[in-house]
Amino acid sequence: MLGGEDPLDGISVYESNAQEPHYHMVSYGFSELYYDEEKAGGEFSKFGFELTFRLKKENNENFHWAMNLMQNLAKYVFKSGKWFEEFHFIPANGPIKLESDTDITALAFVLDPELKKIDTPHGEVSFLQMVGLTTSEYEQLKQNPKLVETEKLIEKLKATNPLLITDLNRK
């Protein structure tokens, strides 16, 4: 997925059977991808993160909508200069998969349980995983929008879903 008006250089999609069959998507373009002497040695590489997303496999699932979602988040970051950090959360203003009846209507950002953080010549890069939240989970966080509350919710989700795979059928 290269070129055009999309701000990300690309999104790689990997099939994984860890925990359960799912797609593991990883963005590239929020961090410095090519060595640049002038940008070396910084605390963070560009925005300091890349996005990841784990989507439970369904029969003949079209997952391109998830890549569009990542690109839309990238447009926000690149235009506003604001970035995401661990335990931030945002509403999707409707289902994260448009024209579906999923109750997943918000996202939280957590350190990807497998990719975590890396140090590069340009600085640190955190792999922030987008985790789908139900409407009620989002409403709960909205009542007390503190990072510690998001962390508590994520720990609760991890008890039965350690890789935090988003299941569009979750209620």
Q: Which residues does each predicted region cover?
A:
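Acidic, proline/glycine-rich low-complexity IDRs
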Residues: 1-171
